[in-house]
């Protein structure tokens, strides 16, 4: 391959097309209808490697350039390219796949440094909690912001606690006759008194050890208190409570409209659209008057998801009046996965998802109808059937497929998914890392990308592999800010033509090896901290990364 490319000075997109076609040629099915595939009676599409060797040995540049043109022409049908790649890569060859993976990893580690990603990792603050909680907008703790009142007075507490700067005010929901906006002038004095009292009685957060002021209050049903003593439950619920407070603090600012659009898919006219959507009187099939009251009056169970507001089901009710019954049923039966509920309980094969940020970056609509696939763990992401311009996404612990009509849209959609769900720590033997590489491979092979987009894709490959690897001082970079992450990925330097060609070869080989490994059922293999052996063929990447960090 390299001899052919260098001999005839083939580079850039033509070199990338030649590499790709060489890999899929053995399984290529050609109809020979155009007859332009036949050289001396042999179909070069099905015997591409033999034709390359013959053209190189015979020094026939005209035939060589024709081979390259055929490869480039084949790349125009990206759907066929993806299907042929998938078919070819899932049939293991007699080769040292793990060794090739490690060599690709060594090259990617070098790219991690040269692409600027390592510089950016140095600049990030240290991740305080390495057990990263994955949050998304399909669930919300927003109902617990609102103040329960009875006869115009805040309902008396039965217990108080705190999470960092948030006071937890536990009460009996049956004692309340309404819930109101916490900013209303008439209750500000009582609201501030609660904050001062919690701060006085509990000066240290029982979850984090934080000692400081209390600035906000969340009003929680007393039934929740025992579940918050469970570590995993508290870890997730507290993060969603913190996210709800951050959204509440944007009320009255320009960002409020974006949050409301993201959560509900519509923005009512007038002031304070968030409070309008939460407290508006709804025609619910029960005596509950608002979604806040409906949520707060219903207890969950030991699953933290069962205590939060199911925003996908809420949007179904907003779009179809008769589906408000689903909202009540979902909470009464304490479901934890909204997509499972829609697919299995209601026989709904598709639902709407909203991504305001991707819409702003690509100029496309924020609303997408997506096909509901399998729950995480039920089936491998590699077995999800992808047709035409579909790409995999994820809400909570459930996969879906969505249509991406351009390479830019596919790149950004995948980047957002990877930021939320994939953690590359340099030891590559978990399914999450394989999922990330598979999704990036789908973007690389299925969509026609510009050089700038392939440069961004390389940075995503580096992130999937090394983004959360410990730095020289042992700390882990904090990539939690999605806006900063996308700026680093999408606005980084563009590769030169030579760098682009080498990067494509590395990414392509890694994708090929991953699909081969997974279909050969060799999902787990030695981590990259293995000592060097076989003349250095297997590279100690952990040691090499440590050496790189010492340079910063």
From Swiss-Prot:
A Pfam family name for this chain?
Orbi_NS1
**Source species, domain of life:** Viruses
Give the matching InterPro entries.
Orbi_NS1
Say which family it is in.
Answer: Belongs to the orbivirus non-structural protein NS1 family.
From the Swiss-Prot or TrEMBL record, give the protein name. Non-structural protein NS1
Q: Which organism is it from?
A: Bluetongue virus 17 (isolate USA) (BTV 17)
Organismal lineage: Viruses, Riboviria, Orthornavirae, Duplornaviricota, Resentoviricetes
């Amino acid at each position: 391959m390299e001899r052919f490319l260098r001999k005839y000075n083939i580079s850039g997109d033509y070199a990338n097309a030649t590499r790709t076609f060489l890999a899929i040629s053995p399984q290529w099915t050609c109809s020979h209808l155009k007859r332009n595939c036949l050289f001396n009676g042999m179909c070069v599409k099905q015997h591409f490697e033999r034709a390359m060797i013959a053209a190189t040995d015979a020094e026939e540049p005209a035939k060589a350039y024709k081979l390259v043109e055929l490869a480039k022409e084949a790349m125009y049908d990206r759907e066929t390219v993806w299907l042929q790649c998938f078919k070819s890569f899932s049939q293991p060859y007699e080769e040292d796949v793990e060794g090739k993976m490690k060599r690709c990893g060594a090259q990617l580690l070098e790219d991690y440094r040269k692409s600027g990603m390592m510089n950016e990792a140095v600049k990030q603050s240290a991740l305080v909690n390495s057990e990263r909680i994955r949050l998304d907008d399909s669930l919300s703790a927003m109902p617990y912001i609102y103040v329960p009142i009875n006869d115009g007075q805040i309902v008396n507490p039965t217990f108080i606690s705190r999470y960092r700067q948030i006071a937890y005010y536990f009460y009996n929901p049956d004692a309340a006759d309404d819930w109101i906006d916490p900013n209303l002038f008439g209750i500000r004095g009582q609201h501030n008194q609660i904050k001062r009292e919690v701060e006085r009685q509990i000066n240290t957060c029982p979850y984090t050890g934080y000692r400081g002021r209390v600035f906000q209050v969340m009003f929680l049903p007393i039934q929740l208190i025992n579940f918050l003593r469970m570590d995993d439950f508290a870890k997730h619920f507290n993060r969603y409570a913190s996210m709800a407070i951050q959204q509440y603090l944007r009320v009255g600012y320009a960002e409020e409209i974006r949050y409301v659009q993201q959560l509900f898919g519509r923005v009512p006219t007038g002031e304070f659209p968030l409070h309008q959507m939460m407290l508006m009187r709804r025609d619910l099939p029960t005596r509950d008057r608002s979604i806040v009251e409906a949520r707060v009056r219903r207890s969950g169970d030991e699953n933290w998801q069962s205590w939060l507001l199911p925003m996908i089901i809420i949007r179904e009710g907003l779009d179809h009046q008769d589906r408000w019954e689903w909202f009540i049923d979902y909470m009464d039966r304490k479901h934890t996965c909204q997509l499972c509920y829609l697919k299995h309980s209601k026989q709904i094969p598709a639902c709407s998802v909203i991504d305001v940020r991707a819409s702003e970056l690509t100029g496309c609509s924020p609303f997408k109808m997506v096909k509901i696939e399998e729950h995480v763990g039920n089936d491998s992401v590699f077995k999800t059937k992808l047709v035409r311009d579909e790409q995999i996404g994820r809400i909570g612990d459930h996969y879906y497929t969505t249509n991406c009509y351009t390479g830019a849209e596919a790149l950004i959609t995948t980047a957002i998914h990877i930021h939320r769900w994939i953690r590359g720590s340099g030891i590559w033997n978990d399914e999450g890392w394989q999922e990330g590489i598979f999704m990036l491979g789908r973007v690389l092979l299925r969509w026609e990308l510009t050089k700038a987009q392939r440069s961004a894709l390389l940075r995503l490959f580096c992130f999937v592999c090394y983004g959360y690897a410990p730095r020289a001082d042992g700390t882990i970079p904090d990539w939690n800010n999605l806006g900063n992450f996308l700026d680093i990925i999408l606005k980084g330097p563009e590769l030169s033509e030579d760098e682009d060609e080498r990067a494509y070869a590395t990414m392509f080989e890694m994708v090929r090896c991953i699909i081969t490994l997974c279909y050969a059922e060799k999902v787990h293999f030695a981590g990259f901290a293995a000592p060097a052996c076989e003349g250095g063929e297997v590279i100690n990447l952990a040691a090499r990364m440590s050496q790189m960090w010492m340079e910063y």
